[in-house]
Design a protein with these regions (language model features):
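Buried hydrophobic-core signal for structured, non-transmembrane domains
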Residues: 54-57, 105, 127-129
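Intrinsically disordered, low-complexity Pro/Gly/Ser/Thr-rich segments with frequent PxxP/GP/PP motifs
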Residues: 43-44, 49, 60, 86-113
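Generic structural hydrophobic/aromatic packing signal, biased to beta-strands
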Residues: 21-25, 69, 90, 129
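Short, well-ordered turn and helix-capping elements at secondary-structure junctions
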Residues: 29, 38-40, 113
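Membrane engagement elements in two modes
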Residues: 1-35, 142
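A general secondary-structure signal for short beta-strands and their flanking turns/coil
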Residues: 18-20, 50, 64-66, 100-102, ...
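Mid-length scaffold segments of soluble, non-membrane domains
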Residues: 33-84
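Terminal connector regions
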Residues: 64-74, 78-81, 85-86, 111-142
Length: 142
């Protein structure tokens, strides 16, 4: 993730605010024979509440392939308040030929966002994921 890098958290916040933000999920695949989509395209979530989203993934190729998901949130100023408790994007994923899987991401929006003049009025955010072949991903890191 670029400027909109999200945070990794070990625990949920202690408070849930009676304010909602609409979170849109954008899914992409690069250099893999995979279909990848969110089961829910948009979620209206309360700030501070833990949410769970499922993604459907399918390998339509004829061999086992490995993917790594990169992620980014926009607007980028929101990234520090988008906290993941668990995500398929933390690890390399493998899918056999024809295999379908459900990947899960658990997240919350940090209540501190309402104290930041750059984020307190944000009502819509987009979480984007792109799966790359792990071979491609490793080469790009050299």
């Amino acid at each position: 993730g670029f400027g909109g890098t999200t945070q990794i958290s070990k625990e949920a916040p202690l408070i849930v605010l009676d304010q909602k933000v609409s979170v849109r999920f954008d899914t992409n695949v690069n250099t893999l024979p995979w279909n990848f989509k969110a089961k829910t395209n948009v979620m209206d979530v309360k700030i501070g509440q833990v949410n769970r989203i499922e993604f459907e993934v399918e390998n339509y190729g004829n061999e086992t392939t490995y993917g790594v998901a990169t992620f980014n949130v926009s607007p980028s100023s929101f990234g520090k308040y988008y906290s993941k408790l668990g995500c398929f994007c933390f690890e390399k994923q493998a899918l056999k030929a024809g295999e379908k899987a459900t990947y899960i991401m658990t997240f919350y929006l940090d209540p501190e966002m309402v104290n930041d003049p750059n984020t307190k009025n944000i009502k819509d955010v987009t979480m984007s994921y792109t799966f790359f072949s792990s071979d491609y991903y490793n080469q790009s890191k050299l």
